UniProtKB/Swiss-Prot annotation:
One of its GO terms (molecular function) is RNA binding. Belongs to the Hfq family. GO terms for cellular component: cytosol. GO terms for biological process: regulation of DNA-templated transcription; regulation of RNA stability; regulation of translation, ncRNA-mediated. This is RNA-binding protein Hfq. The keyword Electron transport does not apply. Keywords: RNA-binding, Stress response. Pfam families: Hfq. Residues 10-69 form the Sm domain. RNA chaperone that binds small regulatory RNA (sRNAs) and mRNAs to facilitate mRNA translational regulation in response to envelope stress, environmental stress and changes in metabolite concentrations. Also binds with high specificity to tRNAs.
Length: 81
């Protein structure tokens, strides 16, 4: 995965995790999963609802927070592009 992908992805997922924001995760096959992000790494997201599911990032199409979030980025040297 490119460095730029991590610069966007990690702060977004980390904010959702830290603030316990409920999310809907849509998979590439159309299935909708709901819960809170418990943890994540380069390849997977742990999604907690009644149970914790390990969801592979390559299967994720879209992550939709239940409310607006402000992404805390470490390095603000790069603009939106």
């Amino acid at each position: 995965m490119s460095n730029k992908g991590q610069l966007l992805q990690d702060p977004f997922l980390n904010t959702l995790r830290r603030e316990h924001v409920p999310v809907a995760i849509y998979l590439v096959n159309g299935i909708k999963l709901q819960g809170q992000i418990e943890s994540f790494d380069q390849y997977v997201v742990l999604l907690k609802n009644t149970v914790t599911q390990m969801v592979y990032k390559h299967a994720i199409s879209t992550v939709v927070p239940a409310r607006p979030v402000n992404i805390q980025q470490q390095d603000s040297g790069e603009g939106n592009s």
